[in-house]
C-alpha cells in the first residue's frame, strides 16, 4: 500500500510528490540511486512495467565491439525522453485492470525493442575476388621408372625358342591376297579360281541342294573331305561325274598348289613367331637414353 501523504502538504495539481521507498527487502545498491521528483501530471501509468511479464533475460546488453583501429565501439542505445524515464525497482499495488492491460501492451512493445538486432557499425566491406587462384598441377611420382613407348610395349612378348614376337597381330597367319568384284558380290581369290576352273563349283551346288539340311553346309564347303558324313556317296558321285567333266581330276592337284602357295606367303610375310608350345619371356625395352630393364617372366 502507498504511504499516506502528510496533511501539511497542500493538495494542488502543481504540487510535487516524493517517490516512496520500498520495504527493507530492497538491495542496498538500489537505495543509493538518487530519487527523481516528478510532478503528478507527468506520472503516466502506461510506462509502468510489470515484473511478472517482462523477461529480464532479453534485456541483456551487448558488450563493446572492436573496430579495425582497435578502439572499442559502444553500440548505440535508443534515446528516450526524460519524461518517460521510469525505475524498474518501483512497484505499485492496487492497480486497476486498465493499468495492467496497458502495462502488458507496453511490456510487449519493450520486448520487441529488445529483440530487435542492434545496429551494426559501418565497416569496410571486403574486396570481391576477381582473380581465381592459380591451380598447381602436381605430377605424380613415377615409381616404375620411365614409361615404355607404345611400339615397344606392344611387342614385348618374345618367343623363348626363336626370339620373335608372340603377340596376336604378329603371330596370326597371313593369307593370300583376295578382293571382291562385281559390286561386292564375288570373291576373287586363289581358291575361288581353282573351284571355278575345275568345275568344282557345280559339284558344290549339287551337294548343297541334294543333301540334308544338317549336312548341306559341310558337304558343300568341303566336298572332298573324308571325315564328313556320306563320304562314300560323295566320292562315288564325283568319280562318275569326272567321266563327263574330266576337269574335276585337276581339283586336288590345284588345291595342293594353293596350300603350298599359302605356306610360302605366310613364311615370308609373317613377322611373328610360328613355334608351338613354347614359353614366352618379357623383352628388355629401351626408351631414349635410359634403359629400363624388366625381369624375365616366363608364361
Curated annotation (Swiss-Prot):
- The segment(s) forming the SPR domain are 166-273
Give the keywords, sorted: Acetylation, Cell membrane, Cell projection, Cytoplasm, Developmental protein, Disease variant, Hypogonadotropic hypogonadism, Kallmann syndrome, Membrane, Phosphoprotein
Q: Which GO terms describe its biological process?
A: animal organ development; cellular response to leukemia inhibitory factor; negative regulation of ERK1 and ERK2 cascade; negative regulation of fibroblast growth factor receptor signaling pathway; negative regulation of Ras protein signal transduction; negative regulation of substrate adhesion-dependent cell spreading
**One Gene Ontology MF term:** protein kinase inhibitor activity
- Residues with the N-acetylmethionine modification: 1
Q: Which residues carry this modification: Phosphoserine?
A: 125
Q: Where is the composition biased (Low complexity)?
A: 92-107
Pfam families given in the database record = Sprouty
Q: Where is this region: Disordered?
A: 55-79, 92-126
How does this chain sit within the bilayer?
Peripheral membrane protein
Localization per Swiss-Prot or TrEMBL: Cytoplasm; Cell projection, Ruffle membrane
Q: What does this protein do?
A: Suppresses the insulin receptor and EGFR-transduced MAPK signaling pathway, but does not inhibit MAPK activation by a constitutively active mutant Ras. Probably impairs the formation of GTP-Ras. Inhibits Ras-independent, but not Ras-dependent, activation of RAF1. Represses integrin-mediated cell spreading via inhibition of TESK1-mediated phosphorylation of cofilin.
Involvement in disorder: Hypogonadotropic hypogonadism 17 with or without anosmia: A disorder characterized by absent or incomplete sexual maturation by the age of 18 years, in conjunction with low levels of circulating gonadotropins and testosterone and no other abnormalities of the hypothalamic-pituitary axis. In some cases, it is associated with non-reproductive phenotypes, such as anosmia, cleft palate, and sensorineural hearing loss. Anosmia or hyposmia is related to the absence or hypoplasia of the olfactory bulbs and tracts.
Assembly: Interacts (via C-terminus) with TESK1 (via both C- and N-termini); the interaction inhibits TESK1 kinase activity. Interacts with RAF1. Interacts with CAV1 (via C-terminus).
Q: Which family does it belong to?
A: Belongs to the sprouty family.
Quote the entry's note on domains: The Cys-rich domain is responsible for the localization of the protein to the membrane ruffles.
State the name under which the record lists this protein. Protein sprouty homolog 4
Q: Which organism is it from?
A: Homo sapiens
Amino acid at each position: 500500500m502507498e504511504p499516506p501523504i502528510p496533511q501539511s502538504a497542500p493538495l494542488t495539481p502543481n504540487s510535487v510528490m516524493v517517490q516512496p521507498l520500498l520495504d527493507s527487502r530492497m538491495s542496498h545498491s538500489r537505495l543509493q540511486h538518487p530519487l527523481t521528483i516528478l510532478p503528478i501530471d507527468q506520472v503516466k501509468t502506461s510506462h509502468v512495467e510489470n515484473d511478472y511479464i517482462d523477461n529480464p533475460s532479453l534485456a541483456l546488453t551487448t558488450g563493446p565491439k572492436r573496430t579495425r583501429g582497435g578502439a572499442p565501439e559502444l553500440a548505440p542505445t535508443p534515446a528516450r525522453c526524460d519524461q518517460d524515464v521510469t525505475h524498474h525497482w518501483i512497484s505499485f499495488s492496487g492497480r486497476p485492470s486498465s493499468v495492467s492491460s496497458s502495462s502488458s501492451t507496453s511490456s510487449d512493445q519493450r520486448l520487441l525493442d529488445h529483440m530487435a538486432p542492434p545496429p551494426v557499425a559501418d565497416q569496410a566491406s571486403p574486396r570481391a575476388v576477381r582473380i581465381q587462384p592459380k591451380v598447381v598441377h602436381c605430377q605424380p611420382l613415377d615409381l616404375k621408372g620411365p614409361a615404355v613407348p607404345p611400339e615397344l610395349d606392344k611387342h614385348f612378348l618374345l618367343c623363348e625358342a626363336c626370339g620373335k614376337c608372340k603377340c596376336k597381330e604378329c603371330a596370326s597367319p597371313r593369307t593370300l591376297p583376295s578382293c571382291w568384284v562385281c559390286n561386292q558380290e564375288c570373291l576373287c581369290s586363289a581358291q575361288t579360281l581353282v573351284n571355278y576352273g575345275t568345275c568344282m563349283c557345280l559339284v558344290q551346288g549339287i551337294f548343297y541342294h541334294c543333301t540334308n539340311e544338317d549336312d548341306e553346309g559341310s558337304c558343300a564347303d568341303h566336298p572332298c573331305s573324308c571325315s564328313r558324313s556320306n563320304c562314300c556317296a560323295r566320292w562315288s558321285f564325283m568319280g562318275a561325274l569326272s567321266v563327263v567333266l574330266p576337269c574335276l581330276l585337276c581339283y586336288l592337284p590345284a588345291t595342293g598348289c594353293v596350300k603350298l602357295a599359302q605356306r610360302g606367303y605366310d613364311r615370308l610375310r609373317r613377322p611373328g613367331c610360328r613355334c608351338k608350345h613354347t614359353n614366352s619371356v618379357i623383352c628388355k625395352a629401351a626408351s631414349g637414353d635410359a634403359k629400363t630393364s624388366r625381369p624375365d617372366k616366363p608364361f
